[in-house]
Amino acid sequence: MSYNISLDSLPYFESTYNEEDRSAAAQIVEEELKRSGGLLIKQEEQKKKFQSHRLSDRLENAIVAAGKGEKLAAIDVQRYIQLKPPGTRESLLQSAVVWEYQKSRNDNLYLLEKHGEKAFDSSLEALEVQLELLEKELVNTKKLSQGCNRKRKHYQMEVGARLAEAEVKFGQLLQSSIQCRVATLLS
């Protein structure tokens, strides 16, 4: 009864293992397990027991290579590093536009720092002057409105008096008209 036992290797071991030494070490481990009453777990069972998710092919290949004692291949990061910036016309134009924008922003910040307080004070004074002008216009409009209301009240009173006179005259005319009709009917 022979079990396939793989020995772990050190991850940074530079050379490959000798196959004779590997098989001798595997035999020693197997004999020791039998003597001590330990159980050997088959690799398939071990994978099922300790691996709840599937590893990628690249990672499985790296594990197999490490088990064989091969040196792990490092990731080639040189393809991800650009040593030179892109020199396309569009990128140069875009960087010039951004530089101009940053330059004008820097100038604006400098002007704001140097003259911002004065500009705010003068703007505040201008707002106060406008407030005073609005208050004066409000007072003038209120006076005009009051004058207009006085005139309207005066004309309404005058028209009211005329209307009262007209109603009295109309009542008298109506009364005389009725008296005339009654007199003509009686005669």
UniProtKB/Swiss-Prot annotation:
Involved in mRNA splicing. One of its GO terms (cellular component) is spliceosomal complex. One of its GO terms (biological process) is mRNA cis splicing, via spliceosome. The keyword Iron-sulfur does not apply. It is found in: Nucleus. Belongs to the 40S cdc5-associated complex (or cwf complex), a spliceosome sub-complex reminiscent of a late-stage spliceosome composed of the U2, U5 and U6 snRNAs and at least brr2, cdc5, cwf2/prp3, cwf3/syf1, cwf4/syf3, cwf5/ecm2, spp42/cwf6, cwf7/spf27, cwf8, cwf9, cwf10, cwf11, cwf12, prp45/cwf13, cwf14, cwf15, cwf16, cwf17, cwf18, cwf19, cwf20, cwf21, cwf22, cwf23, cwf24, cwf25, cwf26, cyp7/cwf27, cwf28, cwf29/ist3, lea1, msl1, prp5/cwf1, prp10, prp12/sap130, prp17, prp22, sap61, sap62, sap114, sap145, slu7, smb1, smd1, smd3, smf1, smg1 and syf2. InterPro entries: SPF27. Keywords: mRNA processing, mRNA splicing, Nucleus, Spliceosome. It comes from the Eukaryota. Belongs to the SPF27 family. This is Pre-mRNA-splicing factor cwf7. Transmembrane segments: none annotated. Pfam families: BCAS2. The keyword Nucleus applies.
